[in-house]
């Protein structure tokens, strides 16, 4: 029904299916077209899905795709950091975050995500949001643009690109993705980098437009707090900025916190799982090249907060 293939579907199901029972709630916080959730609903009979997406078009596709499970699904049009508003004190057994762009978003030039196809400078996941890439590129100061390109795109030519954008917009407003893509291509030495020179800048703009990294940290912290004992959080990230947030947060909750100068025995509330499932197989990458940058991380809650309370132990003699 659409060209989007769920990334690392087998690995995701391998982590999620064993812990989902009848009546258990799982949150697909980035529902997209519903590919992951469809597989999980098929194999985990009796589990209840809360599917969340800020993209109304994607949500409509998922609703249609999952119509056979309508009695077990609730669909929410919102950003994924707001999932707790809809749970009515429920504690989910599973959270899934697939942070990648869907093919249907990238391949539709009218959405403005692609640097390969001409379209409006939009990049909004939720098309009712106010800020667009056009407003950022034509309205932000040169200093602000440099910060965005460096922080969110890790772009080594951030200063050069921002300067050229400000120069170009002083002549006429930047309107299309191809304008910006060509401007970046003209500024950056082609022999220095692999791939398209606009890739990092477009990533940075998309993150800024949609506040992606801020929402991610907030959502993961809420998920860690609400997750049932025995439940799991599974995250697919696609660039180092996302993965760094996930990695550091998961590591921090899966090790004992030992204050300096105290003898304390405290079992961590979470443990890292799925370390052998981090990256897609070569066969999947061959069939779906967009999966090549995927990175899978997961944690399982092994204790409640009260069970993991610190205990003072005697120092060694």
From Swiss-Prot:
One Pfam family, short name: Methyltransf_5
Record's keyword annotation contains Transport: no
A biological-process GO annotation: rRNA base methylation
A GO MF label: rRNA (cytosine-N4-)-methyltransferase activity
Reactions catalysed, as given in the entry: cytidine(1402) in 16S rRNA + S-adenosyl-L-methionine = N(4)-methylcytidine(1402) in 16S rRNA + S-adenosyl-L-homocysteine + H(+)
InterPro entries: RsmH, SAM-dep_MeTrfase_MraW_recog, SAM-dependent_MTases_sf
EC number(s) on file: 2.1.1.199
GO CC terms of this entry: cytoplasm
Enzyme class: transferase
Major localization class: cytoplasm
Chain residues that bind S-adenosyl-L-methionine: 34-36, 53, 80, 98, 105
Gene3D superfamilies: Putative methyltransferase TM0872, insert domain (1.10.150.170), Vaccinia Virus protein VP39 (3.40.50.150)
Keyword Ribosomal protein: no
Keywords: Cytoplasm, Methyltransferase, rRNA processing, S-adenosyl-L-methionine, Transferase
Localization per record: Cytoplasm
Family: Belongs to the methyltransferase superfamily. RsmH family.
Functional description taken from the UniProt entry: Specifically methylates the N4 position of cytidine in position 1402 (C1402) of 16S rRNA.
Record's protein name: Ribosomal RNA small subunit methyltransferase H
The organism of origin for this protein: Tropheryma whipplei (strain Twist) (Whipple's bacillus)
Source organism phylogeny: Bacteria, Bacillati, Actinomycetota, Actinomycetes, Micrococcales
